């Protein structure tokens, strides 16, 4: 590869990962506001820029302009033209994605050379309804290639590829938590043939078990088990359980939030300890419903206001469920809510969106990364994020006021602590949770403007 081709590849990669759009200034009720705006699928999208992020956002927008100018110049050179022609040839020779996209044994889309030519819009996965990008959808279902045990798993399965699409297609892109799968052209397979009925590589995916290399390659749900932590699926008495590795603080945080939600009557995945690991029961009950991460609708934009408006457009009731999730995340200090760890449940037969999925993946919450230094939550970073959201989204604040929010008491906290076999600072947990609840309640009930000047404190005491 020539130096020009290498630089073009570098620029294209950086541009693909860079901020997109332009900065727009608005004056609302006499107050200056700035928004990042861009066009997506023919529609104008907008994201509020917080005061402390404005200069950085401006710099990123200017950086993108500079990259685009350099790329345009390089593509016009002889080496640039040659690189473009080689890339077109590679696309023509890429893996032939031709066949049918299935839901159980029902055809929901026809795919020819990577393009959807016919589809049942009712049942199509949400990501495909929005983008039509079958390659992106397939790639999103593959195991994270950066996990150490992912590489070991592929070696044990004799899978000679680093390509996410090929990895997913090795098991027809099937997963435990939905009934979608890909049927290659000419295949006579039915859903019963491809659905997962066993997993002989669970221990390899979870802990790098060396004995797994002696096993004969077989179908495993680990090739479509996404996420960055080492984990695995185990089939126990006919039910799938997700096992995950971690430390005692991560286990405590996951268990505490699970038990708290259960006692408050909030939808949650069930978690429990099993020896050295924590496990959670498949909340789709063997894909009785289809789970789809919110990334299907918003890509990587986890901004509260953006997600709220997207969900409100589906159903005000689902938007309320999202507000309850944000309430729990804020009170319990979940630092890692992103677009791959919350989502929607859909009816398998009709495609109807039923509800937000239950709360799960709280292993980077509460004290998972140490005891936050601001125990009384007076300058709490996550509550600050909620504050900014409520300031800019009056609809959300009004919905919160209409809702009957749960009430956490000291007795409920003590019950949760008593049921978790992990030693922690009980008084700290009580104070931290109750103060968080009080701060969030104050935000929701407050009538005036919420200050943007407060600097969030994300300090931890380790």
What positions do the PLM features span?
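Broad gene-expression machinery/nucleic-acid interaction feature
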Residues: 33-35, 98, 277, 339
